[in-house]
């Protein structure tokens, strides 16, 4: 796996699934391929994206700044600086300075990542802030190692939270989660169906599913009524794809 592929993997792991994630993935691919060279426009686009947390925006802004060639005097962006200040905690800043001194002596991606993994997410963010604000300089590889270590810590905590929700025994939470997943799947079906004649059936199934979820929420239904709803939708989507000559078996 190449360095940039690894960076893209870690960064995308902390972005919530949805259409915005696909847009960010495309921009990362373009940036890493040297196709998108307007850093100012890229940062303005990132700043106005909804849903993303300030820290995720800060990390993405840092990645873009490291990768896209820019004028030496280009202003640093406030939304990135605010996100990478370690919540203003002086303890985070103290640890960030210690980490920075170690990273300065490290020139490899994996070496920097290993060092960074022993620090808290707040200290890692503060260290990125130091480098972003030009208060310190490390090799690009070391900076990428720092970014990936931060993403790994964030993704770990997100995974724990997700696992807690998936394994919860509370029937109301499980019921709502199944309906949310079914509704999201229906939206994806509508987007994938496009405008071909064969798409009408898939669109109809997706529309009916969304209406059903709305009705279930409006009238209140038994928690077991949503069981299998998402899988039924996915089976319909796969049947539609098969007719279109597309074979994708890994949705479930």
From Swiss-Prot:
A motif (Nuclear localization signal) lies at residues 101-105. InterPro entries: Flu_matrix_M1 (IPR036039), Flu_matrix_M1_C (IPR013188), Flu_matrix_M1_N (IPR001561), Flu_matrix_M1_N_sub1 (IPR015423), Flu_matrix_M1_N_sub2 (IPR015799), INFV_M1 (IPR037533). Belongs to the influenza viruses Matrix protein M1 family. The keyword Membrane applies. It is found in: Virion membrane; Host nucleus. Most abundant protein in virion. When expressed alone can form virus-like particles in transfected cells. Keywords: Host nucleus, Membrane, RNA-binding, Viral matrix protein, Virion. GO terms for molecular function: RNA binding; structural constituent of virion. The keyword tRNA processing does not apply. It is a peripheral membrane protein. This is Matrix protein 1. Residues 165-252 are annotated as: RNP-binding. Plays critical roles in virus replication, from virus entry and uncoating to assembly and budding of the virus particle. M1 binding to ribonucleocapsids (RNPs) in nucleus seems to inhibit viral transcription. Interaction of viral NEP with M1-RNP is thought to promote nuclear export of the complex, which is targeted to the virion assembly site at the apical plasma membrane in polarized epithelial cells. Interactions with NA and HA may bring M1, a non-raft-associated protein, into lipid rafts. Forms a continuous shell on the inner side of the lipid bilayer in virion, where it binds the RNP. The gene is M. GO terms for cellular component: host cell nucleus; membrane; virion membrane. Homodimer and homomultimer. Interacts with NEP. Binds ribonucleocapsid by both interacting with genomic RNA and NP protein. May interact with HA and NA. Cannot bind NP without genomic RNA. GO terms for biological process: viral budding from plasma membrane. Residues 1-164 are annotated as: Membrane-binding.
